[in-house]
Regions:
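Generic alpha-helix structural propensity
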Residues: 1, 12, 22, 36-37, ...
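Short, thiol/selenol-centered motifs that function as redox-active sites or metal-ligating centers
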Residues: 1-2, 212
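Fe-S ferredoxin-like electron-transfer domains
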Residues: 3-177, 182-186, 192-194
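Catalytic alpha/large subunits of respiratory electron-transfer oxidoreductases
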Residues: 46, 50, 97, 104, ...
Length: 397
């Protein structure tokens, strides 16, 4: 679709994405030659593509659908048999209809280059090429469902969201992910009072264009298998009950000061008042507020100005990870660290072993061993490195 007509130049369309700019060029993007060439490219893309738009979950937000409307022919000239392949299993999150695949290899390149996990690859060559996982096992890494957003057709779609709704039926609400401390920018799509799905929003300073699988699929907990009513065990079985019955049963089973409440420093006043009223009704006065130490100090701007940004992690030349399984606790920070390693950064980890997606030196968790090696690492980080970074366990929420 990037073909253009260039004058002066060869008498055939040129790929503008690979064409160097020179003085005096005349670029035509809507000439008859360009239209004919784009129609030919689109016709080749659609040769083996099934006419599944009415039943495809990608319908309404499909790149191939949009490009076909904009640049394609009104009718096909292909009368031969179309290619068909067997379905591939990629796990409980990714639904596959690989007959729709156009072999763009976006999913393969994402898994290898961004996630750093070689789980998705290509078999065979040419028209016979097929995209699949290793031995048709599930794609299990923490960013696997991003291939759903990358797929320009309906070959890879969301299995939990299959046949649930169409894009034009949904209300879009901009939001922030709270499943970890990264604060990824997301968009929540809802129909009525039900949240149907969560999708990433582009923010190059935070999550770029990715989200973790936990962020994407935690919305299921809002409507499925949710404890939205009181249950009491009667005769060995859980049965629905009212709140009054539940509170009376609690007060009877644990009267007086055998019941206590502990509230954190993030609880609002209304909730604290309700908790105090509940304990008073149960005959208890044991209520306490615990300070977690997670409050943010705003008295000194140095705590903000001297810290690295998420994007700044990519420019670090030495990184020390302290007590954090960063790949699972903050997958998008792990992506940034992987980029830094590609640029030559060294990574040191204080804590137990875990499977990284880049070379890292584990210093262990034994205090004796740390006393021997930690000083050397700190010297390397603070003296020899120009842009050191320290990532600690506070990335957990």
């Amino acid at each position: 679709m990037c073909l253009v007509e260039v004058k002066p130049g060869p008498p055939k369309p040129q790929a503008s994405c690979a064409l160097p700019a020179t003085d005096g060029q005349e670029i035509r993007t809507d000439s008859e030659m360009v239209k004919t060439a784009r129609e030919g490219v689109m016709e080749f893309l659609l040769i083996n593509h099934p006419l599944d738009c009415p039943i495809c979950d990608q319908g309404g937000e499909c790149d191939l659908q949009d490009q076909s409307v904009a640049y394609g022919r009104g009718a096909t000239r292909y009368e031969e048999n179309k290619r068909a392949v067997t379905e591939k299993y990629m796990g409980p999150l990714i639904k596959t209809v690989m007959t729709r695949c156009i072999h763009c290899t976006r999913c393969v390149r994402f898994s290898e280059e961004i996630a750093g996990v070689d789980e998705i690859g290509a078999l065979y060559r040419g028209e016979d090429m097929q995209i699949t996982t290793y031995l048709e096992q599930a794609a299990e890494h923490e960013l696997s469902a991003n291939v759903i957003d990358l797929c320009p057709v309906g070959a890879l779609t969301s299995r939990p969201y299959a046949f649930e709704a169409r894009p034009w039926e949904l209300k879009k609400t901009l939001s922030i992910d709270v499943s970890d401390a990264v604060g990824s920018n997301i968009r929540l799509d809802s129909r009525g009072r039900e949240v149907m799905r969560a999708l990433p929003r582009i923010n190059d300073d935070v999550n770029e264009e990715w989200i973790s699988d936990k962020t994407r699929y935690q919305v299921d907990g809002l409507s499925k298998r949710r404890l939205d009513k009181v249950f009491m065990r009667k005769r060995g079985k859980l049965q629905p009950a009212s709140w009054d019955e539940a509170f009376k049963a609690i007060a009877k089973a644990k009267p007086g000061n055998s019941i206590a409440a502990i509230a954190g420093d993030m609880v609002d006043c209304e909730t604290m008042f309700a908790a105090k009223t509940l304990l008073k009704a149960c005959g208890s006065s044991l209520i306490e507020g615990r300070q977690t130490g997670m409050d943010y100090d705003v008295s000194n701007l140095a705590a903000v100005n001297f810290n690295s940004t998420f994007a700044g992690i990519e420019t670090a030349d030495a990184i020390l990870i302290v007590g954090s399984h960063i790949r699972w606790e903050a997958p998008l920070v792990n992506v940034r660290i992987r980029k830094a390693v590609k640029r030559g950064a060294r990574v040191f980890v204080v804590g137990p072993q875990w499977d990284t997606t880049y070379p890292a030196e584990f210093l262990g968790e034994d205090l004796g061993g740390l006393l021997l090696h930690l000083a050397e690492v700190l010297v390397h980080l603070l003296r020899r490195s120009r842009h050191p970074d320290v990532v600690d366990a506070l990335l957990r929420f």
